[in-house]
């Protein structure tokens, strides 16, 4: 340990749109290749039931950086260009505690260059439609709000682009990366993170957020990693189809949120998605080697987390924003190679939320306790479960598919307020959510309990979810209007 530095360094590794079962250690088969992540999770503390309650980029990242639940942050769904006016943030807290704070990669805040408490940000938010609109301010356009794209143009010329192949930020279509691998955004984030290790102030601890924009589309892994899964993947027809899905007969567009695509397209999509994850894993190995070479490994606490998951065609759904496990369940683990935490519980099965990252990292690294809606997981790492949550409320504004849900250790209850429809899944017996039990009379009492509980949670919401103590159908325009407001 550096003699001038008493507190450990903290590295928060964030990936975008990686579902929990895309981490090999969370699977029962050997399809996904993530040896570096598996090593980190198995040597550290793996959270087997980690969730993103509002599963899309903007609300999930607000929860991560502020520790706030959606009712307080105002982020109940995805909406661009709503100002981030939060002052109590994870990087600001570390900064106040004497840390040098750095973010490399994706922020997805507004304004784009708002630092949220970081001393310095090297920004690449990925391919965002909103940044490519014709009426964007000069400094907020895609060409001028990405440090990665600036670097690409410096390396390859002013006409260089990474999206001229037609791949889209929300498409299930696949285009293996056409440039040499060193120009891939995943490599750039790791290269710049290694450069940060070189230029940091060695007299103070650092908090580094390495924020990858992958495996979020465009689905453009380097060809090596794409080919790996085209060879490994067999039958891809099992899409966890249950007794409740409605399949639209029309052929889905490349940007569709639902529908059934041909089996060969499904295979290419999965090969590219898993290929992007294995590529990240490969680059994380490179980064950990650098951390060790700088003699920082045993004085650094790492936390790996995804902002949300991806449906990947399950239940005929794509992308995220849904109340199902593909969207809301995420990989999360702590890697503590120096055994600084010295916990005793390596596999944690309790319900953990993305809001818990903020208070957990601060307490684990500094001993300081901060007040947020999230909770520090320290007690769980020592096998102390008293007072821990056994359920949580989640939601997402998504047009007619807008949802409210309650997840417990055993059950998931879902309400779609625009359609006024309900679902009930017995998660311990039906983890793939194939059998909707809402119509079975033996569960009527349980359903009524969930309805009453959800009505109490939503009683004061401006959308008008509750009338006379009962859940009531809500017009779509009531839900859309709330997305325009931040807190």
Stretch-by-stretch model annotation:
Residues 331, 454-462:
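A short, conserved beta-to-alpha structural element at the edge of catalytic cores
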Residues 428:
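Residues forming the ATP-binding cleft of Hanks-type serine/threonine protein kinase domains
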Residues 298, 371, 420, 461-468:
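Short, polar/charged, Gly/Pro-enriched helix-capping and turn/loop motifs at alpha-helix termini
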Residues 414-416:
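Short beta-strand micro-motifs enriched in acidic
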Residues 1-412, 422, 431-452, 474, ...:
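Formylglycine-dependent sulfatase
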């Amino acid at each position: 340990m550096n003699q001038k530095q008493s507190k450990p360094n903290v590295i928060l590794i964030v990936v975008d749109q990686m579902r929990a079962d895309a981490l090999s250690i969370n699977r029962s088969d050997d399809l996904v290749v993530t040896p570096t992540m598996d090593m980190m999770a198995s040597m550290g503390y793996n959270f087997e039931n980690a969730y993103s309650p509002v599963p899309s980029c903007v609300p999930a990242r607000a929860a991560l950086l502020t520790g706030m639940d959606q009712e307080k942050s105002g982020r109940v769904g995805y909406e661009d260009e709503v100002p981030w006016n939060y002052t109590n943030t994870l990087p600001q807290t570390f900064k106040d505690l004497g840390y040098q704070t750095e973010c490399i990669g994706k922020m997805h805040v507004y304004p784009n260059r708002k630092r949220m408490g970081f001393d310095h940000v090297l920004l690449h938010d990925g391919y965002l439609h909103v940044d490519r609109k014709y009426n964007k301010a000069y400094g907020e356009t895609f060409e001028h709000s990405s440090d990665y794209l600036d670097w690409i143009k410096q390396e390859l010329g002013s006409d260089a682009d990474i999206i001229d192949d037609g791949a889209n930020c929300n498409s299930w279509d696949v285009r293996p990366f056409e440039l040499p691998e060193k120009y891939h955004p995943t490599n750039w984030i790791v290269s710049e993170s290694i450069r940060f290790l070189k230029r940091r102030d060695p007299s103070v601890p650092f908090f580094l957020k390495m924020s990858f924009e992958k495996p979020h589309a465009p689905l453009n892994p380097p060809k090596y990693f794409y080919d790996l899964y085209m060879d490994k993947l067999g039958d891809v027809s099992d899409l966890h189809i249950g007794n409740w899905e409605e399949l639209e007969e029309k052929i889905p567009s490349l940007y569709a949120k639902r529908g059934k695509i041909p089996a060969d397209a499904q295979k290419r999509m999965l090969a590219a998605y898993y290929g992007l994850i294995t590529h990240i894993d490969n680059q994380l190995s490179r980064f950990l080697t650098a951390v060790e070479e700088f003699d920082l490994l045993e004085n650094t606490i790492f936390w790996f987390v995804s902002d949300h998951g991806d449906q990947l065609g399950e239940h005929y759904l794509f992308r995220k924003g849904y109340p199902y496990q593909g969207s809301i369940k995420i990989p999360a683990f702590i890697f503590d190679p120096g055994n600084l935490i010295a916990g005793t519980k390596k596999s944690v099965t309790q319900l953990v939320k993305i809001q818990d990252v903020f208070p957990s990292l601060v307490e684990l690294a500094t001993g300081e306790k901060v007040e947020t809606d999230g909770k520090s997981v320290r007690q769980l790492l020592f096998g102390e479960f008293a007072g821990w949550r056994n359920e949580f409320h989640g939601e997402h504004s998504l047009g007619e598919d807008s949802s409210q849900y309650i997840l417990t250790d055993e059950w998931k209850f879902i309400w779609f307020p625009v359609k006024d429809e309900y679902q009930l899944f017995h998660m311990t017996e039906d983890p793939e959510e194939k059998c909707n039990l809402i119509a079975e009379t033996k569960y009527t009492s349980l359903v009524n309990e969930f309805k009453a509980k959800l009505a109490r949670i939503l009683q004061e919401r401006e959308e008008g979810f509750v009338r006379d103590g009962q859940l009531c159908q809500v017009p779509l325009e009531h839900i859309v209007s709330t997305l325009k407001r931040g807190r």
